[in-house]
Regions:
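Polar low-complexity intrinsically disordered regions enriched in Ser/Thr and small residues
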Residues: 33-35, 74, 95
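Solvent-exposed edge beta-strands and adjacent loop segments
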Residues: 68, 75-82
């Protein structure tokens, strides 16, 4: 399931949407290799198919995203889909599952996470899995980061619990860098 070149295994990954670097938890924990981490992990939930957030009227198809050719975490293809980082845990497994989505208006269509900033602690997030099960997460907090802020806790968790972190852009659009000035992360915990 996890296939990376040696360069990618030993290098942090920069997420162009969120502006974060990702280092696989196996490397952070000193276990030596991504392969060992994959063997040690037992998949207990199916692949995520849909993300539902009733508080902001989101009902989106979940695409699998990995690492793009430029070394960045990939983003969903369209403005209405979300991307699950498939090199990390599945939503509902131990660790931080990460899902990104677009912000703003793209070709006149409000993007899936355009209103993510309106979520509040206690709001529910639902992930529908391939085998028909649903995992419920509860929003813990929202944090804003600058593009260069350290945000390792977005991808890595050491508490042995299942978390879901949603990432989108926010702030002012820079026409030169083609980046937004801030990143919004919604931290949620399995119910």
């Amino acid at each position: 399931m996890i296939m990376l070149s040696l360069v990618m295994v030993f290098s942090p990954v920069f997420d162009r949407l969120s502006g974060y670097h990702y280092v696989h938890p196996a490397l952070m924990a000193g276990r030596g290799s991504v392969l060992q981490a994959a063997i040690q992990e037992q998949t207990v939930v199916g692949l995520p198919l849909r993300l539902r957030i009733p508080a902001i009227h989101v009902d989106a198809v979940v695409e699998r995203v990995g690492i793009a050719s430029d070394g960045a975490m990939d983003v969903p293809k369209g403005p209405l889909e979300v991307g699950w980082f498939d090199l990390g845990p599945r939503p509902g497994e131990k660790g931080n599952a990460v899902i990104d989505g677009h912000f703003g208006t793209i070709k006149g269509i409000p993007a899936v996470f355009n209103n993510l900033y309106t979520l509040r602690a206690g709001d529910k997030i639902y992930i529908e899995h391939g085998q028909g099960t649903i995992t419920t997460f509860v929003v813990r907090e929202l944090k804003r980061f600058g593009p260069t802020d350290d945000a390792v806790d977005v991808f890595v968790s050491s508490d042995g619990k299942a978390h879901l972190n949603l990432i989108t852009c926010e702030g002012e659009w820079n026409k030169i860098t083609k980046l937004y000035s801030e990143r919004l992360v919604v931290f949620a915990d399995v119910e």
